[in-house]
Curated annotation (Swiss-Prot):
Positions bound to Mg(2+): 161, 190, 213
Protein name according to UniProt: o-succinylbenzoate synthase
A GO molecular-function descriptor: O-succinylbenzoate synthase activity
Pathway involvement of the protein, from the record: Quinol/quinone metabolism; 1,4-dihydroxy-2-naphthoate biosynthesis; 1,4-dihydroxy-2-naphthoate from chorismate: step 4/7; Quinol/quinone metabolism; menaquinone biosynthesis
InterPro entries: Enolase-like_C_sf, Enolase-like_N, Enolase_C-like, Mandelate_racemase_C, OSB_synthase_MenC1, OSBS_N
Pfam families for this protein: MenC_N (PF21508), MR_MLE_C (PF13378)
Reactions the enzyme catalyzes: (1R,6R)-6-hydroxy-2-succinyl-cyclohexa-2,4-diene-1-carboxylate = 2-succinylbenzoate + H2O
Family: Belongs to the mandelate racemase/muconate lactonizing enzyme family. MenC type 1 subfamily.
Entry keywords, A to Z: Lyase, Magnesium, Menaquinone biosynthesis, Metal-binding
Functional summary from the UniProt entry: Converts 2-succinyl-6-hydroxy-2,4-cyclohexadiene-1-carboxylate (SHCHC) to 2-succinylbenzoate (OSB).
Species of the source: Escherichia coli O9:H4 (strain HS)
Gene name of the encoded protein: menC
Length: 320
């Protein structure tokens, strides 16, 4: 006997979270809980404003239609990426095919003061990996901050993300302020320039390795080994079903590329599932999941070690 619930939720964000020049005041999304006999599975559907093609209202409509079809015996996944991902997670939990083991190590995210990151990394055991958003300020400032961090922590490897913010000139201005002796400790820089060709040129000219992120979701993208390209950053909420996520990871690994499972600012429930996906598909790579502290609460499932208050399922708005 099948049953299902759908919940709508909204979490207040910390002040200062900006996506594509828009301030994100709340994170809005949906949960689906599928039950069959004694088993149950959960999934999160939370399109990311400015990045997802769909709004959460559109996702809600598709999700409710899919749930009704599933209750009637149909299991075909929806095409909408955020819904496909959330539903496939719920089905995987229901079938016990999403392993419980999780990689809760997250590359800490530096959003502002580099001194805060230095203090956080001082207590980090093992491999020191952190992420810095660049492209939000002047390229020269970004270069100086990155250089400072690499100089201050000799065993640090940085992941940088420019979100295609730079022109070729700005990319060169950034690189000018990063000591060439430190550049090999930039694990990769995600999408430095507005076009892939400009990003490739940046990698050739600076010796700084790059990673594809937004490019993975463009219709003309193909997985190929290229000089200067070291990694792909996979955001499952923006990718689609678990099967599609696994296909992309396998395609990257076949070319010797690093695949990084990365957050689209999901709630704690979604983040714990991403940690399990990372442990399953990319066990040797620290995932990019350090986004929970951008929010003011956890929901339903706790992230280990987080002190944020937890909103239980009974407090959510039930749609079905």
């Amino acid at each position: 006997m099948r049953s299902a619930q759908v919940y709508r939720w909204q979490i207040p964000m910390d002040a200062g979270v900006v996506l594509r020049d828009r301030r994100l005041k709340t994170r809005d999304g949906l949960y689906v809980c599928l039950r069959e006999g004694e088993r149950e599975g959960w999934g999160e559907i939370s399109p990311l404003p400015g990045f997802s093609q769909e709004t959460w209202e559109e996702a809600q409509s598709v999700l409710l239609a899919w749930v009704n079809n599933w209750l009637a015996g149909d299991c075909e996944l929806p095409q909408m990426t955020s819904v496909a991902f959330g539903v496939s997670c719920a089905l995987a939990e229901l079938a016990d095919t999403l392993p419980q083991a999780a990689n809760y190590r997250a590359a800490p995210l530096c959003n502002g003061d580099p001194d805060d990151l230095i203090l956080k990394l001082a207590d980090m055991p093992g491999e020191k990996v952190a992420k810095v958003k660049v492209g939000l300020y002047e390229a020269v400032r970004d270069g100086m901050v990155v250089n400072l961090l690499l100089e201050a922590i000799p065993d640090l490897h940085l992941r940088l993300d420019a979100n295609r913010a730079w022109t070729p000139l700005k990319g060169q201005q950034f690189a000018k302020y990063v000591n060439p002796d430190y550049r090999h400790r930039i694990a990769f820089l995600e999408e430095p320039c507005k076009t892939r060709d400009d990003s490739r040129a940046f990698a050739r000219e600076t010796g700084i390795a790059i990673a594809w992120d937004e490019s993975l979701r463009e219709p003309d993208f193909a997985f190929v080994a290229e000089e200067g390209v070291r990694a792909v950053v996979i955001k499952p909420t923006l990718t689609g079903s678990l099967e599609k996520v696994r296909e992309q990871v396998q395609a990257a690994h076949a070319l010797g590329l690093t695949a990084v499972i990365s957050s689209s600012i999901e709630s704690s429930l979604g983040l714990t599932q991403l940690a399990r996906i990372a442990a399953w598909l990319t066990p040797d790579t620290i995932p990019g999941l350090d986004t929970l502290d951008l929010m003011q609460a956890q929901q339903v499932r706790r992230w280990p070690g987080s002190t944020l208050p937890v909103v239980e399922v009974d407090a959510l708005e039930r749609l079905l």
